[in-house]
Amino acid sequence: MSTRLNFLPDERFAPLRASLKERLQKMADLITPENFPSLLDYRSGSLLRDVFAAVRADEGSVWILDQAKEHLVVSYASGPHAADIMGFKQPLSAGIVSTSFISEQGFAENDVYRHELHSRLLDEKLHVTTYAMIVAPFYILDACRGVISCVQLINVRHEDGRSVPMEEIPGGFSMGNLDAVKRSALVLTDLINYLLLRTAIGWEAN
């Protein structure tokens, strides 16, 4: 028979809670697309690579809101085009990733290249076509700071104003795949929040 272990707040720390919360908020506000990669370690990197592989994505990215709050910027990328994707800016006014961020809702879409919300800016930069996409909001502390996305890609040709796949289309993404990416986003949030907390209190932990 198992028993539940309940931890209670230590009231000795009560006078420090407001100061700690303020310090954590200031630390979070200093996070930018450019310095976000420094928050990732082997655990967070493995988490992202594993979930992208599990859902059979060709590419995966973490997008972080810029300081001007005008663009989402790719601050982590995994896949064959990772080096070309890093630093790419997506206006908040366009694209499924921006819609997910603004609404704080996850998306799992197939036939993305035919979707009216899909922004082709990154496809055109990389000379690829996005077939399927998952996007999940990503939080630091209590605020949405960006999204995690992953895609499946295809080659298409254009006939009579239509995009026609040149190869067998991928399997696409399911709602179960979206749930997997959402869970990984929650774990990544916990890892970064933990890093901020132990840095704020000067706790050296492995």
Feature names for model-found ranges:
Residues 6-9, 13, 148-206:
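Juxtadomain coupling helices with adjacent low-complexity linkers
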Residues 82-83, 110-132, 159-167:
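Signal-transducing coupling segments at domain and membrane junctions
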